[in-house]
Structures are given as C-alpha cells and as structure tokens.
Regions:
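Short, structured coil/loop segments at alpha-helix boundaries
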Residues: 16-20, 60-61, 75, 95
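Short cysteine/histidine-rich zinc-coordinating motifs and their immediately flanking basic loops
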Residues: 42-51, 85-93
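Divalent metal-coordination and catalytic microenvironments
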Residues: 26, 45, 75
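Short Cys/His-centered divalent metal-binding micro-motifs
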Residues: 36-37, 67-93
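Short, surface-exposed loop/helix-turn segments at secondary-structure junctions
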Residues: 46, 51-66
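A boundary/linker detector
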Residues: 1-42, 50-51, 56, 105-122
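Helix-rich interaction surfaces within compact, conserved domain-sized segments
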Residues: 82-83, 89-118
Length: 122
C-alpha cells in the first residue's frame, strides 16, 4: 500500500498569534455589517491596512493567518462576501473600517496577551 502524502503543516514563526479565547469573544458579537442579524458569527481576519509597525510574524502571509488581534465578527454570508469581492471593496461597500473595529474588539478582549499586543502597536 502506498503511503499517503500530506502537506507539511505551516509553521508560524515568532511568538504565538492564535488566541482561541479571543476569537470566541469576537464570535459572541453581532455581524459587523449594520442591520445584519444573521448567524452563525465567524471571526474574520483583517489582512489589508495593518499598522506599519506590525511585526512580520503577526502579518500573516501565504499559508498563514494574521495575528488573532486582527479579527472582526461577520456572519457566514458576509464572511464569504468579504473573500469574494475583496477586503477593501467589502469595507467600502458597507462603509466599515475593518481594522479599527478589529482593534477596538482586541482592546476589550478577555485575553491579556491580545490587549498587550495591541498596546504595543500604538
């Protein structure tokens, strides 16, 4: 029998960037799109317009997600829409500053490390 080939797991270089407790906190909010009451809510990562002093390890990249402090809540429909039309078009269409919303949630996070990371960016 042939051995099944699997892709190697992508490794995140640098300090920890995944905070499941923070993502759960974000999923506890309503969809970021005004007037939307759909669910379930997903934690969506912001990739565009990150602060210039964001360390490389927290920016994400090919096969890597950005730091979990850069997440905002969206229902499944709007999360798919964000990927389909692009992050900047999605933000312009709904008149939302995704980064500002994500950082606002990160400042109120129940995870001290997330709050500390956001403070280091300002």
């Amino acid at each position: 029998m042939l051995k099944r080939r699997t892709r190697p797991k992508m490794r995140q270089d640098g300090p920890k960037c995944e905070w499941p407790r923070h993502r759960k906190f974000v999923r506890g909010h309503t969809c970021i799109v005004p007037g939307c009451a759909d669910g379930p809510i997903e934690a969506c990562h912001v990739r565009k317009g990150l602060p210039s002093n964001t360390p490389d390890f927290a920016r994400g990249g090919v096969g890597k997600k950005p730091h979990d402090c850069f997440v905002f809540p969206a229902c499944s429909k709007h999360h798919k829409s964000q990927h389909a039309i692009g992050e900047l078009s999605f933000a312009a269409l709904h008149r939302i500053n995704l980064l500002r919303e994500a950082l606002d949630l990160a400042r109120r996070s129940p995870v001290p490390e997330v709050r500390e990371f956001v403070r280091s960016l300002t």
